[in-house]
């Protein structure tokens, strides 16, 4: 059951941004050919639900999945509605991947059903650039409602599937999501001197409608929300391509 007071406050806040005129694209590319070439829409559909989960219940993988979503939202236009169940988001961390605090509207839900209802309300509004939520349980019927709301509002929906205390794969249950992603931390980029380099992630496209899965080792989002292929991998790929042409 959704919380009427939260929905009412959200509607009041959204009325303050009505009337914005934004140019809508059909898809948001990653700008990485290896990923965009695999995605059925040559990018993430901007009128669809996409699910993300950390590879484990650990804090590192959970943070990586959160920042992966924040980077996507940073590259979309306009305000972002972020619906939470717990107050563990670190706004300066979101800003480091390009999602400024001034763009984010926060809503706190009392349970997963409340969270999904608030997300649906935001998706239908049409003046938001992205709607993000975090839930442990979102069944096929609930995700189908989110997908229909995303299509109707032409707004991207990003749902972080958190690990349940009982264990299991958060992406194992049936879902109407167009894409499903699993994010894991990886050893950071090596530096020529002592220090910590740019974070790296193992990004796995577990499933997508109309396309194949895939997995990539990437450098984490920069201040513009963009991931990158590590330089060493680019050089090795270029060298391999040259050898193939010579053969």
Residues of each region from the PLM?
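Detector for small/aliphatic-rich hydrophobic stretches
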Residues: 1-82, 101, 207-211, 217, ...
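Conserved nucleotide-cofactor-binding alpha/beta core module
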Residues: 77-144, 148-153, 162-163
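Conserved beta-strand scaffold positions in the cores of enzyme catalytic domains, especially
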Residues: 49-51, 106, 180
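Phosphate-binding/switch region of NTP-binding enzymes
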Residues: 164-230
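Solvent-exposed alpha-helices and their adjacent loops that cap or buttress functional pockets
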Residues: 44-45, 123-125, 151, 173, ...
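Arginine/glycine-rich "motif VI" loop of SF2 helicases in the C-terminal RecA-like domain
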Residues: 148-155, 196, 210
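Flexible, glycine-rich phosphate/dinucleotide-binding loops
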Residues: 58, 89, 113, 166, ...
């Amino acid at each position: 059951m959704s919380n009427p007071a939260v929905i009412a406050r959200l509607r009041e806040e959204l009325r303050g941004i009505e009337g914005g005129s934004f140019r809508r694209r059909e898809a948001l590319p990653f700008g990485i050919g290896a990923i965009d070439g695999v995605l059925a829409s040559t990018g993430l559909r901007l009128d669809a639900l996409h699910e993300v989960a950390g590879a484990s219940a650990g804090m590192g993988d959970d943070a990586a999945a959160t920042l992966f979503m924040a980077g996507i939202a940073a590259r979309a236009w306009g305000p972002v509605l972020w619906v939470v169940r717990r107050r563990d988001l670190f706004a300066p961390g979101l800003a480091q991947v390009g999602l400024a605090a001034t763009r984010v509207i926060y809503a706190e839900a009392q349970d997963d059903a409340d969270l999904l209802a608030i997300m649906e309300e935001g998706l239908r509004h049409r003046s938001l650039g992205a709607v993000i939520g975090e839930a442990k349980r979102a069944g096929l019927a609930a995700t189908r409602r989110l997908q229909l709301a995303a299509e109707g509002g032409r707004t991207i929906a990003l749902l972080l599937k958190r690990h349940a205390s009982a264990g299991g794969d958060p992406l194992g249950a049936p879902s109407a999501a167009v894409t499903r992603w699993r994010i894991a931390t990886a050893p950071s980029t090596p530096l020529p001197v002592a220090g910590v380099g740019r974070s790296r992630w193992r990004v796995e496209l577990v499933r997508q409608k109309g396309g194949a899965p895939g997995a990539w080792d990437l450098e984490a989002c920069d201040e513009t929300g963009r991931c990158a292929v590590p330089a060493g991998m680019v050089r090795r790929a270029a060298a391999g391509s040259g050898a193939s042409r010579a053969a």
